[in-house]
């Protein structure tokens, strides 16, 4: 299986309370089909953080993976920017 075909997202960590799991908020701007206004859509993903290295506020890149639990289908690829 090619790893290149897996989706990646960049988002902000909003929760790190679970062991080896983070919650990542991904924001996306889409144009309304009729009115053309840019609308912000947000979605939360649970991602696997093997080393428990992420903290709230970090910008991270996550990648699709096989299902790891009931809700977890993403894994941490890299920390783009640490929280200030």
Curated annotation (Swiss-Prot):
<keyword id="KW-0689">Ribosomal protein</keyword>
<comment type="similarity">
    <text>Belongs to the universal ribosomal protein uS17 family.</text>
</comment>
<dbReference type="GO" id="GO:0022627">
    <property type="term" value="C:cytosolic small ribosomal subunit"/>
</dbReference>
<keyword id="KW-0694">RNA-binding</keyword>
<dbReference type="InterPro" id="IPR000266">
    <property type="entry name" value="Ribosomal_uS17"/>
</dbReference>
<dbReference type="InterPro" id="IPR019984">
    <property type="entry name" value="Ribosomal_uS17_bact/chlr"/>
</dbReference>
<protein>
    <recommendedName>
        <fullName>Small ribosomal subunit protein uS17</fullName>
    </recommendedName>
</protein>
<dbReference type="GO" id="GO:0006412">
    <property type="term" value="P:translation"/>
</dbReference>
<dbReference type="GO" id="GO:0003735">
    <property type="term" value="F:structural constituent of ribosome"/>
</dbReference>
<dbReference type="InterPro" id="IPR019979">
    <property type="entry name" value="Ribosomal_uS17_CS"/>
</dbReference>
<dbReference type="Pfam" id="PF00366">
    <property type="entry name" value="Ribosomal_S17"/>
</dbReference>
<dbReference type="InterPro" id="IPR012340">
    <property type="entry name" value="NA-bd_OB-fold"/>
</dbReference>
<comment type="subunit">
    <text>Part of the 30S ribosomal subunit.</text>
</comment>
<comment type="function">
    <text>One of the primary rRNA binding proteins, it binds specifically to the 5'-end of 16S ribosomal RNA.</text>
</comment>
<keyword id="KW-0699">rRNA-binding</keyword>
<dbReference type="GO" id="GO:0019843">
    <property type="term" value="F:rRNA binding"/>
</dbReference>
<keyword id="KW-0687">Ribonucleoprotein</keyword>
């Amino acid at each position: 299986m090619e790893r290149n075909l897996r989706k990646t997202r960049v988002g902000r960590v909003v929760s790190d309370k679970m062991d080896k799991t983070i919650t990542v908020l991904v924001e996306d701007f889409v144009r309304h089909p009729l009115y053309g206004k840019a609308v912000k859509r947000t979605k939360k993903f649970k991602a696997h953080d093997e080393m428990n290295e992420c903290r709230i506020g970090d910008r991270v890149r996550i990648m699709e993976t096989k299902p790891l639990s009931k809700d977890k289908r993403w894994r941490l690829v890299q920390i783009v920017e640490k929280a200030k």
